[in-house]
């Protein structure tokens, strides 16, 4: 695990974005942890979040021309990542996001920002069912662009309805790479290093035995 990954987990726990306990997911599964990126809701948090996304992107070394943030949660993530790439990595990258409903007046259409063209890096918080990715792929293909990769905060490393995780399904279906700042395995490693989280680690390991990939 790299320093920026350790720092990200610490940051997420400090801000209450990553919590431990019992949480019923949409799938009906009772998860021993919950990740809610919507709680990165202050200016300073958002600036810091962008730096983590930018670090993960640079670390992965995937070539791309434009950042795309699917509405709604992907919009501030794409924005802050673009700022962090410019400020910290000397990369002035265009970004784009979509509207949920197409605008019929003014500039019209359902895309805002830079043209969606070339190699697209899609940024979002997590992939649960892959629905947002599939909807975004329709937009990307309509613009004759290609999906270079997907960047998310946390890989839950959890099976969907079949044997694969939602991330593995996205990678298979769209022949692309999904990059995450951290994975659930990284979270477990971090908790082990910090100490005092034996119950949380045991609960996560049991959950992974049932639903992990």
Swiss-Prot record:
<dbReference type="GO" id="GO:0044205">
    <property type="term" value="P:'de novo' UMP biosynthetic process"/>
</dbReference>
<dbReference type="GO" id="GO:0006207">
    <property type="term" value="P:'de novo' pyrimidine nucleobase biosynthetic process"/>
</dbReference>
<feature type="binding site">
    <location>
        <position position="128"/>
    </location>
    <ligand>
        <name>orotate</name>
    </ligand>
</feature>
<dbReference type="Pfam" id="PF00156">
    <property type="entry name" value="Pribosyltran"/>
</dbReference>
<feature type="binding site">
    <location>
        <position position="103"/>
    </location>
    <ligand>
        <name>5-phospho-alpha-D-ribose 1-diphosphate</name>
    </ligand>
</feature>
<dbReference type="GO" id="GO:0004588">
    <property type="term" value="F:orotate phosphoribosyltransferase activity"/>
</dbReference>
<dbReference type="InterPro" id="IPR000836">
    <property type="entry name" value="PRibTrfase_dom"/>
</dbReference>
<feature type="binding site" description="in other chain">
    <location>
        <position position="100"/>
    </location>
    <ligand>
        <name>5-phospho-alpha-D-ribose 1-diphosphate</name>
    </ligand>
</feature>
<dbReference type="InterPro" id="IPR029057">
    <property type="entry name" value="PRTase-like"/>
</dbReference>
<dbReference type="GO" id="GO:0005737">
    <property type="term" value="C:cytoplasm"/>
</dbReference>
<keyword id="KW-0460">Magnesium</keyword>
<dbReference type="GO" id="GO:0046132">
    <property type="term" value="P:pyrimidine ribonucleoside biosynthetic process"/>
</dbReference>
<comment type="function">
    <text>Catalyzes the transfer of a ribosyl phosphate group from 5-phosphoribose 1-diphosphate to orotate, leading to the formation of orotidine monophosphate (OMP).</text>
</comment>
<comment type="pathway">
    <text>Pyrimidine metabolism; UMP biosynthesis via de novo pathway; UMP from orotate: step 1/2.</text>
</comment>
<comment type="subunit">
    <text>Homodimer.</text>
</comment>
<feature type="binding site">
    <location>
        <position position="105"/>
    </location>
    <ligand>
        <name>5-phospho-alpha-D-ribose 1-diphosphate</name>
    </ligand>
</feature>
<feature type="binding site" description="in other chain">
    <location>
        <begin position="72"/>
        <end position="73"/>
    </location>
    <ligand>
        <name>5-phospho-alpha-D-ribose 1-diphosphate</name>
    </ligand>
</feature>
<dbReference type="InterPro" id="IPR023031">
    <property type="entry name" value="OPRT"/>
</dbReference>
<comment type="similarity">
    <text>Belongs to the purine/pyrimidine phosphoribosyltransferase family. PyrE subfamily.</text>
</comment>
<keyword id="KW-0328">Glycosyltransferase</keyword>
<feature type="binding site" description="in other chain">
    <location>
        <begin position="124"/>
        <end position="132"/>
    </location>
    <ligand>
        <name>5-phospho-alpha-D-ribose 1-diphosphate</name>
    </ligand>
</feature>
<dbReference type="GO" id="GO:0000287">
    <property type="term" value="F:magnesium ion binding"/>
</dbReference>
<feature type="binding site">
    <location>
        <position position="156"/>
    </location>
    <ligand>
        <name>orotate</name>
    </ligand>
</feature>
<keyword id="KW-0665">Pyrimidine biosynthesis</keyword>
<protein>
    <recommendedName>
        <fullName>Orotate phosphoribosyltransferase</fullName>
        <ecNumber>2.4.2.10</ecNumber>
    </recommendedName>
</protein>
<feature type="binding site">
    <location>
        <position position="99"/>
    </location>
    <ligand>
        <name>5-phospho-alpha-D-ribose 1-diphosphate</name>
    </ligand>
</feature>
<keyword id="KW-0808">Transferase</keyword>
<dbReference type="InterPro" id="IPR004467">
    <property type="entry name" value="Or_phspho_trans_dom"/>
</dbReference>
<feature type="binding site" description="in other chain">
    <location>
        <position position="26"/>
    </location>
    <ligand>
        <name>5-phospho-alpha-D-ribose 1-diphosphate</name>
    </ligand>
</feature>
<feature type="binding site">
    <location>
        <begin position="34"/>
        <end position="35"/>
    </location>
    <ligand>
        <name>orotate</name>
    </ligand>
</feature>
